[in-house]
Amino acid sequence: MIIYKDIISGDEVLSDNFKIKEVDGVLYECDCRKYLKRKNEDIQLEGANPSAEEGDDDAGGDGEEVMVHDIEDQFRLVWLKTEEGMKPSKDAFKSHLKTYMKKVLAKLQEKGVPEAEIDAFKKGAPAAVKKILANYDNYDVLMGHSMDGDAMHVLIDFREDGVTPYATLWKHGLEEMKV
C-alpha cells in the first residue's frame, strides 16, 4: 500500500486505496464517498470483537450522526466548514496558495527532484490555481490533522452527476510512503 503524505506537514492525506487520476500534470483527483458516521465514534480495530469487551452498546459516541467523506474519516482530515466560519475567504485562500506554491517548490529543490519535474510543476501550477480559484465557492476545504496553516488544503467538490464527491490534491505536494 502507498500512503501519500503532505511534504510540508507530514500529514497523511491520501492512499492508493483510492482510484487516483492525474489532472494537467500537477493535480490528483480521487472519487470519494459520503456516509453517515456516529459523532465522536471510537475507532474499532479490524478483527476486534466488541461484544467480548465490557461496556455499553453506545460506547462509540453520543448517538448523533454526521455526514463525513471517506477521505476525511480515514486520514483524520479537518473540515473547514463555512457555517463555522473556518473556511478561508477566496482572497485568503489565494494568498495561501501563493505561499504554498513557494514552499512546495523549495521542498522539491531541497529533495533534489529532477529539473524536468520542477519545470512541469512551474509550468502547470498557474493554470491549476486559476481553475481552482474559479471553482473555489463549490469546494469543501479540508486540512490535515496537524492543522498546519502552511500545508496543503484538500479540496472536495462533486462530479457533474451532482452525487459523486471527489478530492483534489497537489501532486507535487505529496510524497509517497510504502507500507
From Swiss-Prot:
Keywords, in A-Z order: Cytoplasm, Cytoskeleton, Microtubule, Protein biosynthesis
UniProt-listed GO biological process terms: translation
Protein localization: Cytoplasm, Cytoskeleton
Span of domain TCTP: 1-179
A Pfam family hit: TCTP
Origin: domain of life: Eukaryota
InterPro entries according to UniProt: Mss4-like_sf (IPR011057), Mss4/transl-control_tumour (IPR011323), TCTP (IPR034737), Translation_control_tumour_CS (IPR018103), Translational_control_tumour_p (IPR018105)
Gene Ontology MF term list: calcium ion binding
Cytoplasm in keyword set: yes
Function of the molecule: Involved in protein synthesis. Involved in microtubule stabilization.
Name this polypeptide is given: Translationally-controlled tumor protein homolog
Native species: Aspergillus fumigatus (strain ATCC MYA-4609 / CBS 101355 / FGSC A1100 / Af293) (Neosartorya fumigata)
Organism phylogeny: Eukaryota, Fungi, Dikarya, Ascomycota, Pezizomycotina
